[in-house]
């Protein structure tokens, strides 16, 4: 793939990104800022979202900005990904299925100078998408239909930089521009009386800063451990919200200044590396959503997540493409930030497995692209009674292009 083709591809992906299907159809996206997107790329998704201790010159790891210092001297990486999913909703004996597709991320990584790497990319921060209704009997001759719809989301273009001041220490910083629109609408339709509607609208324009660090401890030539940590401080999201209440005879509008807050986030983890063949690790993430407001009224629950994963790479170099496939699997358990009923939230767990398949040039010597494929099962179960269970079967597909942009060619 030449530079012109890559430029065209990047331009198209950037242009269609905000307009692609947001890939969500969940009633739980009506809470807060919606369903939080997976803030990771191809290899992380194969390992349950693991990433605080991962670093590699072959892949981009946006989970920890300190990993950008591992960028290769002579190459530039481009990575893009999509996902396809089938969702099952269960409420009592009732079941409904839905299918979604989404554009998930676009990123690039390159070396600025010795021991300094940079990454630039685009991915969603959260997604909102739902539409459902329920019918109630208000009396002998009157019924009401409650309807709920929502759409929108928050997007996150970012730029990150990392520096390796010591052979075993890297520090990094990612700055993101957070922007988007969120709309919720709730309506009540009566058979014999006045209809009512409440509309929630928010426009978000803010920023997000993530600070990362990684430390490598080598035990011998075969064994090492990489420790990683990331911190992001919370602040107002500069989100002006509007609530409009209407019925057949009147309309009221309320303006809310700074209707949303971004939570502070802390995460830490490690990766144990054995001969660059086996890698295994654990991550923990905590987000202080209980200090965040949504439309100036409701608050969230503190979110925590534990991830674990393993990677197996049979060999570094081989003429047999199948011997260079890298295999990964992982799992996670999380408590989402959404408060759905009487102070109670949900439990979420997921398992994933996948592989990365390299493609070689005509001389079978250099990999210009790596295909990432993973399957994922996710279950979301509410702690409150009378709520909906959600189960996801998801296929993640990503591709990394490895271009030798900085190689000096010799003319004979």
Indicate where each model-derived feature is located:
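Hydrophobic h-region of N-terminal signal peptides that target proteins for export
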Residues: 11-19
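A periodicity- and composition-biased signal for non-globular, repetitive helical segments
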Residues: 9-10, 36
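Sec-dependent signal peptide recognition
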Residues: 2-9
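Subset of outer-membrane beta-barrel
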Residues: 21-412
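Generic N-terminal leader/processing signal
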Residues: 1-2, 215
